[in-house]
Structure formats: C-alpha cells, structure tokens
C-alpha cells in the first residue's frame, strides 16, 4: 500500500472551475478571467525574452518585478515577494506560520482553497459565516489561531469589508491577518497601508484578474520585511520563469492600459447588474469582476444548464448554501448582451 500521509489520504482536493478544451467555442464567464487581452507592452516584453536567454536560469529573486511592484504600491522592494500566482503565497504563508494541528480560519463563503492548503499542512480549519448585512458572525474579540484569511472583495459574493473593519481585525487577530486582494483593483479600496501599521498584516495580490495574466501565474505579497524573508526561505528558488518576470514588469508599468480595462469591466458589471434586476433576479452589489445573482425561482442549477446548453459558461456551486445562485464573470459588453439574451430565453 502506498504510504500516503494520513491528512493527504483523507482530503478531497480543490476542484477548479470547468476549463473547456476549446474555450473559443464558449462565452466563458466561469473563472473570473479578464474580458480583455493583456497590454501590448506585455506581449512585446515576452517576445523580447524568447531566444538565447531561455537557456539561462531566471533571476531567483525576481528583483525587477519586486521593484516594479514596490514603485507602484509605494514600498521598498524588501516588502514585496513575487510568486507563481497568489496561490503560491497563500500556500507558503501556511507553511511558514501554521504547524500541524494549528488552526487557520477564513470567511465562509470565500476561497475554499484556503482549506485545501491547510489540509495539506495538517492544520485545522475553522470558518466564520456572514450576517445578513455582510458582517462576520460570531467572530471572537480575540482570535488565537495562526492565520485568518479575509478575501476582500469577497468571492463569490463581491461585497467589500471596510478598511476600518479590517484595521479592527488586525488588532483582534493574534496571528497573521492575510487580506486576499485578488479583486481589489476593481473595487478601488485596499488595506496596503495597514501593512506598515501592523506587523501581522499581509496583503496578497494577483495579476491574473485585473492585469489579464491568468495564463502566466503571477502574484505577489506585501508584508513586513521579516515576513517576506520567511517566505523567501520556503518558496521555490526559481518560482518565476523569465517570461513571467518580463510580463510582470511590463504589466505593472502600463497603468494607462490597466485602468482603462478595469473601467470598462466595472461599467459593464453595473449595466449587467441592472439588466438582471429587470428580470427580477436578485443581485448582490459587487466590487469585483463578477456578480453573484439568484433567479426568481432560486434554481441556480436550472439556469446554469440553460446557459451551458447555449455555450455560455458560468459558475454554479454544489454547496447547498450557494446552489440557489450563480457567479457570473463580467465579459465584454457584447458577451454580456448575449448572456442577457440567453437569460431572457431561459426565463
């Protein structure tokens, strides 16, 4: 018998959103990818790296990427670590701060991959639910677990916790408070300033969503230098290849392109939300590049299948607390108009 660790043998593993073999055959609104291509400067930077240099190892520290992020966010480079997607940062935070048997916690519902990463480490998982007005339910005055993950804006719902509340949490969490800002660029709010004020605050970011680089796997964390030093100890030593590093620098450097893409997505999101309400769908006001919406009959599976039959992919969760609704990524205006036409047909 294969001698798997007990915690690995009993875990189910994370199930990502459906990826069709031919994405071009669908309107793909199920994994919160950006509706628009990356900046042309990104493509130029990648092509400039293709050639003789590929036989050489990349910069193990991703210094150019750290410096670009530091300039953008107003930190010194030693406060930044670059990663193979923000998932690598989340994984390494648990490896660095949670021993086997320690507790980590997160908001439910949010990114269930936190639980998967904790299970790999052998840590215990606790979740805190939400009240009807999007507050944390039954959260203690002092949380003594090793890490508390806060996705802001929340996914799948899209609402945001206020900066004041996040600062309050920083004082109530004894361990590390990790603010996962995967979708923060669509909201305009950030907790980055709290990193300077509280030694236990880490902010994670990704270039997958707002910078259109999901296919490159690029993320980063902003934290105190001593936290970054710990993450540097355990990350893969060549975690970003040459192409990814070049893409990161170019993407972060082209803020005009970035801002225009975000503007168009937010504008389409607000239009789509208003159109859904005309069909009597309930829509949670969203600060991400997606909306969580519930049809009048609360049968999310029925609407999901109707859209799937029309080659429109959205996200339906089997979780009974989410199965009544759908999370729909925001595509181009044309894609969302076609989606609305399909929803009118489905009824």
UniProtKB/Swiss-Prot annotation:
Cofactor(s) needed for function: pyridoxal 5'-phosphate
SUPFAM superfamilies linked: PLP-dependent transferases
Cross-referenced CDD domains: AAT_like (cd00609)
A GO term for molecular function: histidinol-phosphate transaminase activity
Assigned EC number: 2.6.1.9
UniProt entry keywords in alphabetical sequence: Amino-acid biosynthesis, Aminotransferase, Histidine biosynthesis, Pyridoxal phosphate, Transferase
Any one GO BP annotation for this protein: L-histidine biosynthetic process
Ribosomal protein keyword on record: no
InterPro entries membership: Aminotrans_II_pyridoxalP_BS, Aminotransferase_I/II_large, HisP_aminotrans, PyrdxlP-dep_Trfase, PyrdxlP-dep_Trfase_major, PyrdxlP-dep_Trfase_small
Pathway assigned to this chain's UniProt record: Amino-acid biosynthesis; L-histidine biosynthesis; L-histidine from 5-phospho-alpha-D-ribose 1-diphosphate: step 7/9
Sites of N6-(pyridoxal phosphate)lysine modification: 209
Reactions accelerated catalytically: L-histidinol phosphate + 2-oxoglutarate = 3-(imidazol-4-yl)-2-oxopropyl phosphate + L-glutamate
Enzyme class: transferase
Subunit structure, interactors included: Homodimer.
Family: Belongs to the class-II pyridoxal-phosphate-dependent aminotransferase family. Histidinol-phosphate aminotransferase subfamily.
Name listed for the protein in its UniProt record: Histidinol-phosphate aminotransferase
Organism: Geotalea uraniireducens (strain Rf4)
């Amino acid at each position: 018998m294969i001698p798997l660790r007990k915690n690995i043998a009993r875990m189910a593993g994370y199930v990502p959103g459906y990826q069709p073999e031919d994405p071009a055959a669908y309107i793909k609104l199920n994994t919160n990818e950006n509706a628009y291509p990356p900046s042309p400067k990104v493509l130029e930077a990648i092509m400039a790296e293709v050639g003789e240099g590929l036989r050489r190892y990349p910069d193990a520290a991703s210094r150019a990427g750290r410096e670009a992020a530091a300039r953008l966010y107003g930190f010194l480079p030693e406060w930044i670590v670059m990663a193979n997607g923000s998932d690598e940062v989340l994984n390494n935070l648990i490896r660095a701060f949670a021993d086997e048997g320690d507790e980590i916690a997160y908001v439910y519902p949010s990114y269930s991959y936190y639980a998967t990463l904790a299970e790999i480490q052998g840590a215990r998982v606790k979740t805190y639910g939400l009240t009807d007005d999007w507050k944390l339910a039954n959260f203690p005055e002092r949380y003594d677990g090793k890490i508390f993950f806060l996705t802001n804006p929340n996914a799948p719902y899209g609402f945001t916790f206020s900066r004041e509340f996040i600062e309050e949490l920083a004082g109530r969490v004894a361990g590390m408070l990790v603010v996962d800002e995967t979708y923060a660029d669509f909201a305009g709010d950030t907790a980055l300033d709290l990193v300077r004020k509280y030694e236990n605050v880490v902010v994670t970011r990704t270039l997958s969503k707002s910078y259109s680089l999901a296919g490159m796997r690029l993320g980063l964390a902003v934290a105190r230098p001593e936290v970054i030093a710990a993450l540097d100890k355990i990350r893969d030593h060549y975690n970003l290849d040459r192409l990814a590093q070049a893409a990161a620098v170019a993407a972060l450097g082209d803020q005009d392109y970035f801002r225009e893409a975000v503007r168009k997505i937010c504008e389409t999101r607000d239009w789509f939300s208003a159109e859904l309400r005309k069909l009597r769908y309930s829509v949670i006001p969203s600060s991400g590049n997606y909306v969580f919406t519930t049809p009048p009959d609360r049968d999310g599976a029925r609407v999901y299948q109707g859209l799937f039959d029309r080659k429109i992919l959205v996200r339906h969760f089997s979780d009974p607390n989410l199965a009544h609704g759908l999370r729909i990524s925001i595509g181009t205006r044309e894609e969302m108009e076609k989606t609305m036409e399909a929803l009118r047909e489905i009824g």
